[in-house]
Amino acid sequence: MIIPAIDLIDGQVVRLFQGDYAKKTEFSLDPKNQLLSYQQDGAALLHLVDLTGAKDPDKRQTKLIEEIAASLSTPLQVGGGIRSAADVDALLNAGVARVVIGSLAVKSPEVVLRLFDKYGGDAICLALDVNIDADGNKMVAVHGWQQGGGKSLESLVDTFMPAGLKHALVTDISRDGTMTGANTALYCELAERFNEVQWQASGGVATLDDVKAVKTSGASGIIIGKALLTGVFSAKEAIACWPNV
């Protein structure tokens, strides 16, 4: 499945390079219209990251997100600085289909376990942003990749599997925004080890061949942001390579 994505800062569509706010590219696009165009191209799931909220939780773009979700018939998953159960409640009440939770799952797993119990596995997607060292250890980063979380990807998955984990978005930080190709070996490994989880791949997609490679890796879907925004290929072309299941 192709999952078109946009990142928002103060209502503006942007892309960051490897999570760095100082390395920002702005796009003169209306976020609602952009997601509607992806919907019209056939996307079955859309992804939005609230980078303003990620940086300052008091400035979350919840009202804009609610307006965007209301304009779409396609499910919208939203992440970016989810720091509490109240943040999750607010987004789901705003019409978001699924909330993407990263740092909170690392730092306060008991809070997220209660959210799984309250909302079920389809309403929550874990965001596991990993730095992979020379020995292949996959350590999860937190707070917009500014800090190490001190936990491995595998240990976090093991924590949440009994609670009903169904969806996980994994980004190889070294590939994000680089358009150097996705880390297909990572997704092959995860899909084989944790085949109950629907893995969403993210980071590095530059060509339709990259899309095809991830399709065969065992991942259930791929998040594509920059390649669509810069016109390398269209959402329609990507979906033709990897039709919705």
Curated annotation (Swiss-Prot):
Quote the cellular component terms of the Gene Ontology held in the record: cytoplasm
- Active site annotation, chain numbering: 7, 129
Intracellular or extracellular location(s):
Cytoplasm
Listed pathway(s) = Amino-acid biosynthesis; L-histidine biosynthesis; L-histidine from 5-phospho-alpha-D-ribose 1-diphosphate: step 4/9
Which InterPro entries does the protein's record reference? Answer: Aldolase_TIM (IPR013785), His_biosynth (IPR006062), HisA_bact_arch (IPR006063), Isoase_HisA-like (IPR044524), Isoase_HisA-like_bact (IPR023016), RibuloseP-bd_barrel (IPR011060)
EC supergroup of this enzyme: isomerase
One of the GO biological process terms: L-tryptophan biosynthetic process
**Belongs to which family?**
Belongs to the HisA/HisF family.
According to its UniProt record, the EC number is: 5.3.1.16
Q: Which cysteines are joined by disulfide bonds?
A: none
PANTHER family attached to this UniProt entry = 1-(5-PHOSPHORIBOSYL)-5-[(5-PHOSPHORIBOSYLAMINO)METHYLIDENEAMINO] IMIDAZOLE-4-CARBOXAMIDE ISOMERASE
> Keyword set for this entry?
Amino-acid biosynthesis, Cytoplasm, Histidine biosynthesis, Isomerase
Under which name does UniProt file this protein? 1-(5-phosphoribosyl)-5-[(5-phosphoribosylamino)methylideneamino] imidazole-4-carboxamide isomerase
Q: Name one GO molecular function term.
A: 1-(5-phosphoribosyl)-5-[(5-phosphoribosylamino)methylideneamino]imidazole-4-carboxamide isomerase activity
Q: Which Pfam families match?
A: His_biosynth (PF00977)
Q: Which reaction does it catalyse?
A: 1-(5-phospho-beta-D-ribosyl)-5-[(5-phospho-beta-D-ribosylamino)methylideneamino]imidazole-4-carboxamide = 5-[(5-phospho-1-deoxy-D-ribulos-1-ylimino)methylamino]-1-(5-phospho-beta-D-ribosyl)imidazole-4-carboxamide
